[in-house]
């Protein structure tokens, strides 16, 4: 009998984490996601009625932003972290839409540091294959033929999305929600963006919000002029980061509306001097947060 009691207790102990993995909050909320801590203060400061939950080390903050119910969390840097934490949020909260707010590298020569980009589709620029080198150049090898773009040995291509007994869906671009893009386009002209960090520490231009165009993400920090030019030409991308396409991928599979606001903290290797992220990270984060606040306040 004592042995049976011990076994039951052990089974209950193993079952506890599964039971705890249910919903933590039933209120329909907009998920507002950032990658890492420097992108968070302006959003947290704009959130009232805060309650905190911690799941496997990830902190989720519920509350109200511009009067709308939200849940905020940090995805963590890079693709796997972003996918993992986004799915955690979907599993534990009643997420009605996903909004990403953060900084990124600009690849469109027409854009500058401090500008905010709201891309209409996101792809993964390092999803694909590293090709074998042959006598006549790089050889495609046993890889799907619909190669999207190449940079030397790197061949980017679509991902396969499982569909049960049906053939997998092959997709490179993951779209932002059209209705959310309309809201973004409506509020964008009226949002004041910062040009200066402090007296004497100002950008040479007044930042702007750009709605539309493409963005790409990958598990590398890009600070390389040649690769930046490749991304702009091959993907017709405006912006490059390390998380958004992964979040868009998860949102697409879960049929959850998604949109991302990325403010340029640097030019991904296109800067005239050293990379500017350490100089303009705070300004870019606050510009992105300002647009997100206006966007959330305009939601129905």
Model-predicted segments: where are they?
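Bacterial N-terminal signal peptides
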Residues: 5-15
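Sec/Tat signal peptide C-region and signal peptidase I cleavage site
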Residues: 17-20
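Glycine-rich phosphate- or other oxyanion-binding loops that anchor nucleotides, phosphorylated ligands
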Residues: 22-29, 54-300
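Short, conserved "active-site rim" segments that organize catalytic pockets and cofactor/ligand binding
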Residues: 27-47, 64, 69
């Amino acid at each position: 009998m004592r042995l049976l009691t011990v076994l039951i207790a052990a089974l209950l102990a193993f079952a506890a984490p599964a039971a705890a993995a249910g919903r933590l909050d039933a209120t329909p909320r907009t998920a507002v996601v950032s990658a890492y801590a420097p992108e968070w203060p302006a959003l947290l400061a704009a959130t009232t009625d805060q309650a905190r939950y911690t799941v496997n080390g990830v902190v989720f903050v519920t509350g109200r932003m511009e009067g709308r119910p939200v849940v905020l969390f940090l995805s963590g840097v890079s693709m796997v972290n972003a996918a993992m934490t986004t799915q955690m949020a979907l599993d534990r909260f009643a997420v009605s839409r996903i909004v990403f707010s953060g900084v990124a590298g600009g690849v469109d020569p027409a854009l500058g540091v401090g500008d905010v980009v709201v891309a209409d589709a996101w792809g993964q620029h390092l999803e694909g294959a590293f090709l074998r080198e042959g006598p006549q150049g790089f050889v495609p090898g046993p890889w799907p033929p619909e190669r999207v773009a190449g940079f030397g040995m790197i061949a980017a291509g679509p991902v396969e999305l499982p569909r049960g007994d049906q053939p997998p869906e092959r997709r490179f671009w993951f779209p932002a929600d059209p209705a959310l893009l309309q809201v973004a386009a409506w509020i964008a002209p009226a949002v004041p963006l910062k040009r200066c960090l402090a007296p004497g520490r100002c950008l040479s231009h007044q930042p702007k919000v750009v709605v539309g165009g493409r963005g790409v993400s990958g598990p590398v920090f890009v600070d390389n002029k040649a690769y930046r030019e490749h991304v702009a030409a091959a993907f017709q991308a405006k912006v490059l980061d390390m998380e958004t396409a992964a979040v868009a991928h998860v949102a697409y599979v879960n049929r959850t509306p998604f949109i991302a606001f990325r403010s340029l903290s640097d030019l991904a290797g296109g800067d005239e001097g050293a990379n500017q992220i350490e100089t303009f990270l705070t300004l870019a984060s606050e510009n992105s947060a300002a647009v997100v606040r206006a966007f959330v306040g305009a939601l129905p």
